[in-house]
């Protein structure tokens, strides 16, 4: 776990080295997104780490909002790295906001690992709006 004040770029050389070495493990970058620690200045608002982490082929990146998402991601990472023996490492953004953690909806595990799942349906209205979000902004989206 590291304080990602300036984001993934701060540890970029180490991340590339981990990729080249085929390292396995988890990097948890604290203070994710552009919404946390806004009062401390823009340098504390990491909004670009996923652009940088996406350039490393064996770096798997996630921006979870809820604790159950983090549990699903870590469980899948352990399976991939240690059972399947894949040479991947994970970058996971975590945040420092305190809020109510919901129970995990049934059947979201596969969608979360793939990158998207339906958190709640919109009902049976004819016109629908599809909202997407992750990480620090998801609570405002819902």
Question: Locations of the language-model features?
Answer:
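Thiamine diphosphate
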Residues: 1-57, 68-75, 79, 135-137, ...
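Short catalytic-loop micro-motif centered on adjacent basic/acidic residues
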Residues: 1-2, 60-63, 131
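General beta-strand structural signal in soluble alpha/beta enzymes
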Residues: 28-30, 61-65, 93-94
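Glycine-/acidic-rich phosphate or pyrophosphate-binding loops and their flanking alpha/beta elements
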Residues: 47-50, 56-57, 70-142
